[in-house]
Amino acid sequence: MVGPAMPAVTIHELRKRFPRTTALDGLSFTVQAGEVVGLLGANGAGKTTTLHILLGLILPSAGRVEVFGQAPRAHRKAALRRVGFASPEALMDWRLTVAENLRVFAGLYDVPREAVPRMIERFELDPMADQPFGELSLGQQTRAGLARALLHDPDLLVLDEPTASLDPDIADKTRQLLLRVRRERGLAILYSSHNMTEVEDVCDRVVFVHHGRVVAEGTPLAVSRQVLGSDALDAASMEEVFLKISRDGVA
């Protein structure tokens, strides 16, 4: 008999204290393999701190974090080989060309160099492959950042505001690209965003965080009904959920 699949992400009673503030106060949630989960909340809710702990960039004060059953700090190389990360900053060298950036990253992860031109073609980066990353538009930088994040074929993609500062048309194209990647690869995605329309389109479940705690969790429809008591779900209702939780802090 085959047992249940191991969660892609397990976060249990996570706490993080800084000298003047408590960023996380008993945060708990999971992301199952192949699932897309939105991590939502106002600025200062604890989303970025959660992602930094998950990526092994900072240590928690207490609690447990696992990526496919491994602690990111204790097994950093093994755990993070299974993780791709993309954010507006994209972790790219702005002086290098797109192709050079991808080749550097391929070398770090022992990815065959021939994977780079394939990824450039797949993300429609051919026209700007030989341009310095810093000269690209925001939409092009976002695509290049996603290409870098997926180059080593991860099982989990962590996205921090992937469409922030993009105009609506480019944001929609980026969203469609993410949906295509999800369909093709079946990878788990942890998706931090302020864009509620985007969340509805992309996420299977949402986790709302307020002052370092989970205050609502479930499908977008379930959370909307829990918070607003409504029977309908549309973009406006999810915006209302976000505003109510940001204002009141409790569902």
Predicted regions and their residues:
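Conserved ABC ATPase "signature" region
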Residues: R103, G107, R113-M128
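Conserved catalytic motifs of ABC-family nucleotide-binding domains
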Residues: D153
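Catalytic Walker B motif of ABC-type/P-loop ATPase nucleotide-binding domains
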Residues: L157-E161
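Helical segment within the ABC ATPase nucleotide-binding domain
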Residues: D172-R185
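ABC ATPase "signature
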Residues: E217-G218
